[in-house]
């Protein structure tokens, strides 16, 4: 399968090597009905999205410039905003006592909720595609973010408990202040660790 190394083939670029590799693999394997066959449905969905877009890219269905993926993400966020807010413009929210007291609206229109879910799926697919193009595992990125959030939220719980109060007795701005302080401490430890290496 490596004619550019062991045979008569030549390949000047990495993309030419990959294209030749795919051609040889397709000749050796039975024909697939779809380029997307063989991607396990049991994969976590972010990983599956990255794999689907990777397979499509192998046959040229990809943005020629990876920066275009951010424009696609903006487009998808705009479409989600239309379903959520009735406008493609993302709202700018300035926190205040009034906005903090407004409860989330329950979905009253099932069709609109379904469209919003579809648009959110498109946003997540675009994010997985960005991860793929930059060589980032989206599942690993999300796992690390979940772990960071857990540590930081638990820091809020600890600080509140040590103050003799419950979470329900603490304002959102105070909780956010504790969260951000813990985040700065974590980043300071990471910076100090990097300096010693």
Regions found by a protein language model. Name each.
Residues 1-120, 125-197:
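Flexible "arm" and connector segments at domain edges
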